[in-house]
């Protein structure tokens, strides 16, 4: 009988979480949702010195922002130590593990001898019990590590959903340390016990874990467990072709939020960073879940492309509700010194957002563009000298007069602009540029008629007339 699908995301809280990390949450989340299964969050925090609550919080915050909800967890490995110790005791009792007293110095010396002889460096089984074998006398006062009694013959085989059939000879594997001298279990051991206890059916993770897989399968089988389906995802590369990492300049997941990216854009981009559905580039979260499968996971490293993410973000910004974007823009406006009081004195923020969003790739850019509506203009003196010339002043005066009398609609403002151009035999930039400078303080705005309508008649006319006084 087919087991109900259960997937997991099992990060180590030892640093910030970047897009390459969170992709290993997105795919198992999507697969669990597609298969009506269960998605488990497990925090692998056995590296006590490097783990931190701050890193855990960053993981949870990033998952929440991207909408990667989990059904069980977070489950912390440090809270399962009693269970690990019980399994270690069981393995010792059943002869599946044994104490090893070889010191680190002895092991280093052994490996040096093996290298000198052209052999693969590995533990040689000195303390491994065998029928008829006489073991050395345990040294006084030395606490042993525990090693897993790996099979000496045969082959570990699994059909990886990404890499295809993988075969590793047990002769290549030495007896893995599964507990330290102080009794604390090792990562590879904890992972096996967790996956077994949590009935994980599919392990979707980075291919930096491939070398761990045959050892984990052997331990799992020794404990009577059924190996899950493995899907080892190729590395995510940065734009320079290096493995994505903090050291190589990767941004944290939340840095994308703080830069003005929308979560749906990041999810869409991440989904395509190692998986495909035909030629589809833009799709909703619901479509992604419906389409996701393991068969179309990429087999080659995926390279991050910031311009592609920005393009997707621009698409989702255009599609987003103005009120939602306005709320998201508020922190960016605050950072620009534009508070609620300033916004209250200007045009409706939703309307400003609606005008500015078609030109923006991030919410931050929307806020930067919207700021002109809530500030007293301070145009550059050189720009004023260039655009507000004696030749154009009569046209500006006529335009101000026309705008005083016009209906305050985009169409009426546009008609006033065109009539002024015709009267003074000017081209649009000759009039629009000085008007932009005087009203908005910049020559870079959306369509001039739409901008003037939002500024309002009083602000537009008074600012033009003040410059002509």
Curated annotation (Swiss-Prot):
Monomer. Residues 118-131 have a biased composition (Basic and acidic residues). It is found in: Cytoplasm. This is Glutamate--tRNA ligase. InterPro entries: aa-tRNA-synth_I_cd-bd (IPR045462), aa-tRNA-synth_I_codon-bd_sub2 (IPR020751), aa-tRNA-synth_I_CS (IPR001412), aa_tRNA-synth_I_cd-bd_sf (IPR008925), Glu-tRNA-ligase_bac/mito (IPR004527), Glu-tRNA-synth_I_codon-bd_sub1 (IPR020752), Glu/Gln-tRNA-synth (IPR000924), Glu/Gln-tRNA-synth_Ib_cat-dom (IPR020058). Transmembrane segments: none annotated. ATP binds at residue 246. Belongs to the class-I aminoacyl-tRNA synthetase family. Glutamate--tRNA ligase type 1 subfamily. Residues 118-138 are annotated as: Disordered. Its EC number is 6.1.1.17. Its main location: cytoplasm. It comes from Burkholderia vietnamiensis (strain G4 / LMG 22486) (Burkholderia cepacia (strain R1808)). Keywords: Aminoacyl-tRNA synthetase, ATP-binding, Cytoplasm, Ligase, Nucleotide-binding, Protein biosynthesis. A motif ('HIGH' region) lies at residues 11-21. Catalyzes the attachment of glutamate to tRNA(Glu) in a two-step reaction: glutamate is first activated by ATP to form Glu-AMP and then transferred to the acceptor end of tRNA(Glu). It catalyses: tRNA(Glu) + L-glutamate + ATP = L-glutamyl-tRNA(Glu) + AMP + diphosphate. Signal peptide: none annotated. CDD domains: GluRS_core. GO terms for cellular component: cytosol. PANTHER family: GLUTAMATE--TRNA LIGASE (PTHR43311), GLUTAMATE--TRNA LIGASE, MITOCHONDRIAL-RELATED (PTHR43311:SF2). A motif ('KMSKS' region) lies at residues 243-247. Coiled coil: none annotated. GO terms for biological process: glutamyl-tRNA aminoacylation. GO terms for molecular function: ATP binding; glutamate-tRNA ligase activity; tRNA binding; zinc ion binding.
């Amino acid at each position: 009988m087919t087991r109900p699908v259960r997937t997991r995301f099992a990060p180590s809280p030892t640093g910030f979480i970047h897009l390459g990390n969170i992709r290993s949450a997105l795919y198992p989340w999507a697969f669990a949702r597609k298969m009506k299964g269960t998605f488990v969050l497990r925090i692998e925090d056995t590296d006590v010195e490097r783990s931190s609550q701050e890193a855990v919080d960053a993981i949870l915050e990033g998952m929440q922002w991207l909408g990667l909800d989990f059904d069980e967890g977070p489950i912390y490995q440090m809270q399962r130590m009693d269970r690990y110790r019980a399994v270690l005791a069981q393995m010792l009792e059943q002869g599946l593990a044994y104490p090893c007293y070889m010191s680190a110095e002895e092991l280093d010396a052994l490996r040096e001898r093996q290298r000198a002889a052209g052999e693969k460096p590995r533990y040689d089984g000195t303390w491994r019990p065998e029928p008829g074998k006489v073991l050395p006398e345990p040294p006084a006062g030395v606490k042993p590590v525990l090693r897993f009694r790996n099979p000496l013959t045969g082959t570990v085989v699994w059909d990886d959903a990404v890499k295809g059939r993988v075969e590793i000879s047990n002769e290549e594997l030495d007896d893995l340390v599964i507990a330290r001298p102080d009794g604390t279990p090792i990562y590879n051991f904890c992972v096996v016990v967790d996956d077994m206890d949590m009935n994980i059916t599919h392990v979707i993770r980075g291919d930096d874990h491939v070398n761990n897989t045959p050892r984990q399968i052997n331990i799992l089988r020794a404990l009577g467990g059924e190996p899950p389906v493995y899907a080892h995802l190729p590395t995510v590369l940065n734009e320079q072709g290096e493995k994505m990492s903090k050291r190589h300049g990767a941004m944290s997941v939340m840095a994308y939020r703080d830069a003005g990216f929308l979560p749906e854009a990041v999810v869409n981009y991440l989904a395509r960073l190692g998986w495909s559905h035909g030629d589809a580039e833009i799709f909703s979260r619901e479509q992604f879940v419906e389409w996701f499968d393991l068969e179309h996971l990429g087999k080659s490293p995926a390279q991050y492309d910031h311009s592609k993410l920005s393009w997707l973000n621009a698409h989702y910004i255009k599609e987003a509700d103005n009120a939602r974007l306005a709320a998201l823009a508020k922190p960016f406006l605050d950072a620009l010194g534009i508070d609620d009081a300033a916004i209250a004195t200007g045009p409706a923020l939703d309307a400003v957002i609606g005008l500015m969003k078609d030109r923006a790739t991030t919410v931050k850019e929307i806020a930067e563009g919207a700021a002109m509506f809530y500030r007293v203009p301070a145009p550059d003196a050189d720009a004023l000298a260039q655009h507000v010339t004696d030749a154009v002043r009569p046209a500006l005066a006529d335009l101000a007069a026309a705008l005083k009398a016009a209906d305050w609609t985009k169409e009426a403002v546009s008609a006033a602009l065109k009539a002024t151009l015709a009267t003074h035999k000017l081209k649009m930039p000759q009039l629009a540029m000085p008007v932009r400078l005087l009203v908005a303080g910049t020559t870079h705005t959306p369509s001039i008629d739409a901008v003037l309508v939002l500024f309002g008649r009083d602000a537009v006319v008074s600012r033009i007339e003040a410059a002509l006084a």
